[in-house]
A protein has these predicted regions:
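Positively charged, solvent-exposed patches that mediate nucleic-acid binding
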Residues: 1-110
Length: 110
């Protein structure tokens, strides 16, 4: 994921979450908001309840690779992916399948 495609600031996260537009499943919650840019900006959040820093960073790396495999970054959206505890209990393929399912739900809502 390129640097220009990432959401980092807390105010950007809050702006997207305040819209309350979301889709969710057992492994992820995705908050989204349309933007005026020609590309998507994506933020990943994994809470402290998920585990220690090593586990949280590993899950973020896995989510980034899932996003690189499945998501079209040329869409004009802000997206925040929140990782749930069930993510750790599943293997990569099942998490990938869950993320694809959420993207299909997101496409129906847009």
């Amino acid at each position: 994921m390129k640097k220009e495609n990432s959401l980092k600031k807390a105010k950007d996260f809050q702006k997207v979450i305040d819209t309350r537009q979301s889709v969710g499943c057992k492994s992820f919650v995705i908050y989204y908001l349309k933007n005026e840019l020609d590309y998507a900006r994506i933020g990943i959040s994994s809470g402290k309840r998920l585990g220690n820093a090593v586990i949280r960073n590993r899950t973020k790396r896995q989510v980034r690779s899932i996003i690189d495999l499945t998501f079209d970054k040329n869409r004009s959206l802000y997206i925040i992916v929140i990782v749930r505890n069930k993510f750790l209990e599943q293997d990569f393929e099942n998490n990938l399948k869950d993320f694809k399912y959420l993207l299909s739900k997101l496409n129906k809502n847009l």
